[in-house]
Design a protein with these regions (language model features):
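NTP/phosphate- and nucleic-acid-binding module
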Residues: 1-184
Length: 184
């Protein structure tokens, strides 16, 4: 969105820097190559990259506005799950009937390993949209069935697909998805 900007500078300095250092210091800075039997001053490739520009590039690339079937616009920060600041949101369907209590139990289990948010304000759809906009890859919804079957609904930010999973499996599912090795 900002036009063409340099993210990383790569400069072939050839032997200029080391050659001048050798010239003015009076010290030989050479490498002996045994395969060809010669000494030479090595070439230098200089790179420079700024974290702020890299971060801006990731954010700019991740921001999307999607048109939904109902005509509304969905704002999504589709940052890769391992890089997302908030990994999971815990959302009780309503603020009564024991759902917030179970949601807090789940939050307490997850919060030591993942940056989590708890939200019970507004409708579940509005809460999903808020989490989409800040880049939260997973929303865990606790509903009335959760009290009986000990399962929750996990909603994936990018696809909006939902799946029922056992509460006991939740931690390992999220761990697997937010593992940094997924993007390396």
């Amino acid at each position: 969105p900002f036009g063409f900007k340099e993210l990383e500078g790569i400069h072939s300095r050839t032997d200029f820097d080391l050659g001048n250092h050798q010239k003015f210091s009076g010290k030989k800075i050479q490498y002996f190559d045994p395969e060809v039997g010669e000494n030479y001053v090595p070439y230098v490739v200089e790179t420079s990259i700024g974290v702020d520009r890299m971060f801006l590039a990731v954010l700019s690339h991740s921001y999307k506005e999607e048109q939904l079937e109902n005509g509304e616009t969905r704002v999504v920060l589709g940052i890769p799950a391992p890089l997302a600041p908030v990994k999971v949101a815990v959302l009780p369907l309503i603020k009564k009937d024991g759902l917030p209590e179970l949601a807090r139990e789940i939050m307490d289990d997850l919060k030591y390993d993942f940056n989590c948010q708890y939200d019970e304000k507004d409708s579940i759809g509005k809460r999903y949209r808020r989490q989409d906009a800040i880049g939260t890859p997973f929303c865990v919804t606790i509903d009335h069935d959760s009290l009986n079957d000990r399962c929750v609904t996990v909603r994936h930010r990018d696809t909006m697909e939902q799946q029922r999973v056992k509460i006991e499996d939740l931690h390992s599912i999220i761990s697997k998805e937010v593992n940094l090795s997924n993007i390396l």
